[in-house]
Amino acid sequence: MRQFPSIRGNINEKMMTTMVESQTRSPWRTPVPYLFGGLAAMLGLIAFALLLLACSYWRLSRQTEDEEKQTESGEKVVAKAFEEKILVIMAGQNNPTFLATPVAAKICLDCVNMEKKEGQNGESKVTEENH
């Protein structure tokens, strides 16, 4: 009869080499460290945003307390007036055709007062009254 070579010897050698390879394998080949690293970075970013919100709220509440103390002590609080800046760009064919800025409307209380009064038939009449 014919004799076959020993299979057990080859299997043991292969198992030993795979065990050695798995032990020397880099842990960064799996996605788990990247997953936890990304999760930690996201939680850090959220914590930083919450810290910024808490600090801004604290600063805002401190400013309102200072204003309340000034009004209680009788000091005159000067309101800060900021000019609203609005810019409107009207579209053109190639370039904007013009720029527009808002103009404050001047209302005169002594001017002519226009009032609508309904007539008997439901028609509206415009009357002018001078004050």
Swiss-Prot record:
Its main location: membrane. It is a single-pass membrane protein. The chain crosses the membrane at residues 35-55. Residues 1-34 are extracellular. It comes from the Eukaryota. Residues 56-131 are cytoplasmic. Expressed in the vascular tissues. Also detected in guard cells. One of its GO terms (cellular component) is membrane. InterPro entries: GDU. It is found in: Membrane. One of its GO terms (biological process) is regulation of amino acid export. A motif (VIMAG) lies at residues 88-92. Keywords: Amino-acid transport, Membrane, Transmembrane, Transmembrane helix, Transport. Overexpression of GLUTAMINE DUMPER 5 leads to free amino acid levels accumulation and plant size decrease. The VIMAG motif is necessary for the function of the protein. Belongs to the GLUTAMINE DUMPER 1 (TC 9.B.60) family. Probable subunit of an amino acid transporter involved in the regulation of the amino acid metabolism. Stimulates amino acid export by activating nonselective amino acid facilitators. This is Protein GLUTAMINE DUMPER 5. The lineage of its organism: Eukaryota, Viridiplantae, Streptophyta, Embryophyta, Tracheophyta.
